[in-house]
């Protein structure tokens, strides 16, 4: 069941976000940088996105939080698609992506160039590269690439 995050489930969303973010970034970021992204950091980050009017959703399966996704309604960027590491490969990523796509006319995403797993996921679902932007993380020279959605038939 996908619902908008609120005061009662934002802690669940922050936990999923923290676990998945750390798992997906462990090979590309320093241990110090990863350590900074604890529960409180992720909770504050989600609260900040909500203040910025992002629409953020959480997916529950059998009352267990399994993933999150966000949409910036200003430019239709689909962001914050994170699935709990122990729940990956079970279709929850597809479910959340399809949900987000249904709310956008011209969606796009940005992905770290080093996140091959995410890139493969998006390429298989109709996204194509659209350019590079510098990653704001100054600890490493990491780049994000913008991908636009072209395939309306997932």
Residue ranges and their predicted role:
Residues 5, 108, 112-119, 124-125, ...:
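C-terminal "cap" of GNAT-fold acetyltransferases
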Residues 67-70, 89-93, 126, 131:
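Glycine-centered flexibility sites
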Residues 4-10, 15-86, 97-99, 135, ...:
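Acetyl-CoA-dependent GNAT
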Residues 55, 105-107:
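Short active-site oxyanion
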Residues 11, 90, 116:
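Loop/helix-junction capping segments adjacent to catalytic residues or to phosphate/diphosphate-binding pockets
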Residues 83, 89-102, 120-124:
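Conserved acetyl-CoA-binding loop-helix of GNAT-fold acetyltransferases
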